């Protein structure tokens, strides 16, 4: 695994948010919200394998995000600050509670239900945001954990 860097400059971080918001304004139904990925990733500092497993009901209207970490098996209970909670509620409005918050268009072959996005897709999204923001450093999903963590 290669080492990735946090986003240290607040202006660059805000540019990334602006890019994610602009993308979301013109995204097609069923596409992943780039802004939601940034908001949840930055505010929970969870690994991408844990982020992608969140269901809408586990985030929307909640003061805490609770999850069993996939890598360590430990229970994690993370406070969601009021600003992040407002953004999460806005971004998940109108979505069904049992949907994945970061839902893929790919369906499970056995159940025919949508699956969460892969960590590779989350990485692609983060890199598209970073490149559009002019970030030259190596960026990845772990960047979200490192930025405020």
What are these regions (language model features)?
Residues 19-31, 97, 123-149:
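Short, basic (Lys/Arg/His-rich) helix/loop patches that form interaction surfaces
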Residues 44, 53-86:
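Conserved tyrosine-mediated DNA breakage-rejoining catalytic core shared by Y-recombinases
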Residues 54, 91-94, 105:
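Residue-level signal for well-ordered alpha-helical positions
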Residues 4-5, 70-89, 100-127:
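C-terminal catalytic core of Y-nucleophile DNA break-rejoin enzymes
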Residues 7-44:
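Basic, Lys/Arg- and aromatic-enriched nucleic-acid-binding interface segment
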Residues 30-40, 56, 80, 122, ...:
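Non-catalytic DNA-binding core/recognition domains of DNA-processing enzymes
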Residues 1-8, 55, 138-141:
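A Lys/Arg-rich helix-loop hairpin that forms a DNA/phosphate-binding surface
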């Amino acid at each position: 695994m290669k080492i990735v860097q946090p986003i240290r400059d607040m202006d660059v971080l805000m540019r990334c948010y602006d890019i994610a918001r602009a993308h979301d304004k013109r995204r097609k139904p069923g596409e992943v919200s780039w802004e939601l990925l940034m908001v949840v990733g930055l505010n929970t500092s969870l690994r991408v394998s844990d982020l992608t497993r969140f269901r809408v009901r586990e985030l929307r209207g909640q003061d805490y995000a609770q999850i069993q970490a996939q890598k360590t098996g430990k229970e994690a209970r993370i406070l969601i600050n009021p600003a992040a909670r407002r953004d999460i509620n806005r971004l998940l409005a109108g979505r069904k509670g049992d949907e994945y918050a970061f839902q893929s268009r790919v369906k499970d072959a056995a159940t025919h239900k949508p699956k969460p996005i892969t960590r590779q897709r989350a990485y692609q999204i983060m890199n598209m945001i970073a490149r559009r923001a002019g970030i030259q450093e190596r960026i990845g999903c772990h960047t979200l954990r490192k930025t405020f963590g």
